[in-house]
Amino acid sequence: EPYRRQRQMCIRDRFLIGAALVFFMQAGFAMVETGFTRAKNAGNIIMKNLMDFCIGTVVFVLLGFGLMMAEDYVFGLVGIPNLDIFTDFGGFIKENASSFVFNLVFCATAATIVSGAMAERTKFVSYCIYSGVISLFVYPIEAGWIWNSQGWLAQLGFHDFAGSAAIHSVGGITALIGAIMVGPRLGKYVKDKAGKIKKVNAIPG
């Protein structure tokens, strides 16, 4: 019993340390995306990355995590949300704390990947709506397929240890769809009188 408790504590600490490192990826993404955009849009990019985490936290707490880690799944596709957070918030968080924090930062990462692909071409309010949707439905459902034992991909033996499919593939596919919808950026590369492209805001990235 002492060994089992110690092992669980080590696993929990590992999850929390990993979550802290992934959390700082938000700052990294913000700097990279700022480096790819014009200086006048730097503040917009920073706010979008901040909103990914803020909005994502609220919706992931309310429904996303319960949907992702549901105990009952419908044909392995969609989980029946665990609504214990509304009746026993303290107990729910205490029991699932490390897993919740770990998946929360991954959810924010998946949402942030899209920001760079649609930089300078989306309104702030529209982006906030997108951020809420992906954090509330898209990420919890597809991550549940992989990381919940009841998910259909998990049932087939699919294994994704670090999130290459659950996070980066989903973020990349969503970014591609968004980039196709909004089209190319206009006015990013402007030539001077000599025909040379003016400097871009690449230092932060």
PLM regions: where:
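Single conserved hydrophobic/aromatic residue that forms the stacking wall/gate
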Residues: 1-7, 11
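Loop-to-helix transition at the N-terminal end of transmembrane alpha-helices
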Residues: 12-13, 40-56
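Hydrophobic alpha-helical transmembrane segments
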Residues: 16, 46-50, 101-102, 128-130
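Juxtamembrane interface elements at the cytosolic ends of transmembrane helices
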Residues: 27-35, 109-115, 170-196
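Membrane-water interface regions at transmembrane-helix termini and the short interhelical loops
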Residues: 29-43, 105-125, 142-152, 156-158
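Transmembrane alpha-helix boundary signature
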Residues: 60-94, 113-121, 141-154
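Hydrophobic alpha-helical hairpins/lids featuring a short glycine-rich hinge
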Residues: 90-136
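Membrane-interface loop-to-helix entry segments
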Residues: 101-105, 162-173
